[in-house]
Structures are given as C-alpha cells and as structure tokens.
C-alpha cells in the first residue's frame, strides 16, 4: 500500500468512526472558530488580512475568522484532491477546503508577497525539499508579515528516515535552529536556507503530547531522543519535544 493511500485510509476510518462529529454542529463550530490569539497578536492592528495554512490535511483547524479583522483564510495540501474527494464522499461541507499543491510551489500557486501570515504545522519536515519549501513560504509572505512553523524535533531520525520523514529540524547544542537530513552533510542553520531579509522573531522548545500510532509508541518506549515515555496517574503518556518558531519578513 502506498503512503498516500495509507493516509487517505486513515482519514476515511476517522470520518467513518466519528461521522456525527463532522456533521452540521462541526461545520458551524469551524465557521465561528476564531484564529488563535497568539496568531492574532502577530497580525497587529491590520483591518484585513490574508492567511495561508500549509499542509493542513483535509480540514484546516486554524480558525476561520477574527472578530476584529477581516480575515481571508486559504489552505493548501499536497494531497488536497484526494482529501476533497473524501470530503465529497462523506458529504462534509466545511468553510475552507484545501487546494492541491506542494509547499515548494507556493509562488506559482499564489504569487509573491500575497499573505500576511503563513502557518505550517507538522509539515515542513514532511516536504520533498525543506529548504525550497521554507524559501517559498517566505516568498509568498508580504513584507512585514510572518511565517509560523511548528515541528516535532528530529522527526527524520526518530522515523529512521522512512517515507515522508526525510528531514531533521532541531536546536543545536550551541542554540542554533538547524536543518539536516540523512543524506545532508553538514547540517545548516535553518535561516541560511532563506535569502537575506528575514529574522527569527520567536522560538520555543517544549514538550507536547502528540497523537502517535502504535509504531511511534514502540519507538518512544525504546527511548528515541525526541520521544519521552512517562507514567501519569497510572497511565502511560508519550510526549514529544516540539519546536515552534516564527520568522518575520522585513519590510
């Protein structure tokens, strides 16, 4: 089975087993769900903004509106056509559907300097070319705008560089946000992948509780570096070290 088919089957199973959760109440909730407060803060006092969610899966959960800002949310995913077929199959009507496209092709899809905020969660390190993808994210961001990225630390190494997990993003021992991969030597500072004209606005490294499949949980038990296996109230809890960073485009 291909990775893409496996991914589609995963969502088909979720939709089948949680069908009621994705019907009218969910659609109404999505329509009125506000953009997260920390992202609204990045947008400042602008009256109207355009926001892009990259690698969103079949349903972007970013938040479709802000009470104080005229907000246009768009979403893109490399499997969007298959996801939209799946949404049609189940009859889901959602406020924002993803369009088909790879992160490396953002400029062709949307044009340069098109968005006030670009959001990318758990997908930069899943791209075919993380360096080109990051450059494209910056290119489609307006001067003065922000690129918000969230990844699990060293996903490539934790997954033995299998399938889509070809890249490692991590903070080096000397505190530098770094990009690497199995066949990439030496590893490089992540912002070196981008032309001049940007700066690291914010960075945070913390533990989170991801949704892990059985294989990931087994790796966690075996003590892979970026997964931690703990016991809480008698229940096993897996946490992952997450890196969240924001790049500001000068302007």
Task: For each feature predicted by the language model, list its residue ranges.
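Class I SAM-dependent methyltransferase Rossmann-like catalytic core
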Residues: 1-44
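A short acidic, Gly/Pro-enriched loop at the edge of an enzyme's catalytic core
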Residues: 104-118
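A short glycine-rich, Lys/Arg-flanked "PGG" loop and its adjoining helix->strand segment in the class I
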Residues: 131-146
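C-terminal lobe and adjacent flexible extensions of AdoMet/dcAdoMet transferase-like proteins
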Residues: 227-251
